Amino acid sequence: MENQREEIELTEIPETEKKRTAEEKLLSCSAETAEEKVSLCSEETTDTSSSSSSEQTPAPIEVNVNIQTSTYLPQNAATNLNSLYTSFEDARAQGKGLVRHNSDDLKSFLEKYPPDYRKPKRDLSESWDPGMPKPTLPPRPANLGASQASTVRRHVREQNFKQLRERKANEGKIVKDLKRLEYKVNIILCLVVVILAIILLLTGLSILFIRIKS
């Protein structure tokens, strides 16, 4: 029995080896065919792309441009962006006609402007071009006179606004109370005058009645 089992196992080994070799051959053939297809497709795409690029790409145009003066900038130009940037203060002064911007001026904001640059007194002799005309002063306002001048009235600070409002409210209340008192006093005086007139009439009539009887 043992000899028969060994013979069966020996007969099975060459069959499995044949199957493995057949599978390996199939895999190698499929890989070779796939590589050939990919190479053919890549060659076709390269041919079409080269032909289309040769048809579409125009000849390069040489342009001589001064980067600092012109607004046109070619591609892939090595330019310093700070030379093309104007700060807000420079643009505002340039719009007012005070300063002519210089693109070579690459100083920082703190170096260019001192801490007290917002004050009205500022020396513009360094940045002023002698060829530029001086700005004309605005026309003087008309003389409004003493009655219409803004400095005639007394200026009050904001801290005293509450006190002034309270004073005005108290004054209004006092005026109303005085008016009420005047009205009451007038009514009382009128009543007194009417009573005195009635008394005088009664006394006169009584005197006349007594004389008539006598």
Swiss-Prot record:
UniProt main location, coarse: host cell
Record keyword ATP-binding present: no
Recorded consequence of changing residue 72 to F: Complete loss of tyrosine phosphorylation. Complete loss of STAT activation
Sorted UniProt keywords: Host cell membrane, Host membrane, Host-virus interaction, Membrane, Oncogene, Phosphoprotein, SH3-binding, Transmembrane, Transmembrane helix
Biotechnology: Used in cell biology research to transform T-cell lymphocytes. Saimiriine herpesvirus 2 transforms T-cell lymphocytes, including human, to continuous growth in vitro. 2 viral proteins, Tip and StpC, are essential for this function.
Coiled coil: none
GO CC terms, sorted: host cell plasma membrane; membrane
Annotated region described as SH3B/LBD1, given as residue ranges: 132-141
Disordered: annotated span: 1-59, 117-151
Location of Phosphotyrosine modifications: 72, 85
Bilayer topology annotation: Single-pass membrane protein
Subcellular localization, as worded in the UniProt entry: Host cell membrane
GO molecular function: SH3 domain binding
Residue stretches spanning the membrane: 187-207
Description of how the protein assembles with itself and partners: Binds host LCK, human WDR48 and human NXF1/TAP. Forms a complex with activated LCK and STAT1 and STAT3.
Note, other: In its host, LCK protein is inactivated, preventing T-cell transformation activity.
Its biological purpose: Plays a critical role in virus induced T-cell transformation. Binds to T-cell-specific tyrosine kinase LCK SH2 and SH3 domains, thereby activating its kinase activity. Once phosphorylated by host LCK, forms a complex with at least STAT 1 and 3, resulting on the phosphorylation of STAT3 and presumably STAT1, and their migration into the nucleus to induce transcription of target genes. Stimulates host ILF3/NF-AT-90 activity. Association with host NXF1/TAP transduces the signal up-regulating surface expression of adhesion molecules as well as activating NF-kappa-B activity.
Domain description: The SH3B/LBD1 (SH3-binding) region binds LCK SH3 domain and CSKH (C-terminal Src-related kinase homology) region binds the kinase domains of LCK. Both motif are required to activate LCK.
Protein name: Tyrosine-protein kinase-interacting protein
Source organism per UniProt: Saimiriine herpesvirus 2 (strain 484-77)
